[in-house]
Amino acid sequence: GLDKNTIVVFTSDHGYHMGEHGHWQKQTLFNNATKVPLIINVPGKDYISKISNSPVELIDIFPTLMDLTNIISPSHVVGESLKPIIENKSSDVRKSALTRWRNGYSIRTERFRLTKWDINGDFQYELYDHKFDEEELNNLALDSSYSLIRDSLIKTINRRIIQADMKPEGIGRQIENVLQM
């Protein structure tokens, strides 16, 4: 039947606040709003205890499906295939996951979250260590004992923002041409 040759993907587009951090709904960059379930079931794979904490992004789903079905992804695809994680849960395909909401960006590694807010050109940061603070209640951005981690993550988030804002070759020009008419 279909269960023998169908890949099933289950996810959600965002988490939801129920009063945490004084917020309701999804409109933040805290873990409550950005961490979503992602379950990929591939026929013939053994999934007992196959839980990975590797950071991934939803843009990784398409290249993963292409890779699992042995189809070459188009060159403009920016996600990463999660096939290495599916085959070995201790694998990583990326070191951080990037999220954007309004005037803020956030990256999540296995241990840390750094959020960068642009307040009229003035950058402000939040840094959380999930080893000691899973609820993201203690902002460590100004804690000198975390300065090396913070500075490293600031470089990473700036690089990831530039990469995320780049348009792939040949994509988007059709829309820009229509808007100029």
Predicted regions and their residues:
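Residue-level recognition of short, well-ordered coil/turn positions
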Residues: 1-2, 90-91, 145
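Histidine-centered active-site microenvironments of extracellular/periplasmic hydrolases
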Residues: 2-50, 57
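A general marker of short, structured functional hotspots
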Residues: 12, 26, 121-124, 142
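C-terminal cap/loop subdomain of S1 sulfatases and analogous C-terminal strand-loop tails that border
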Residues: 14-20, 59-62, 66-130, 135, ...
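Active-site rim elements
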Residues: 25, 45-56, 68-73, 136-146
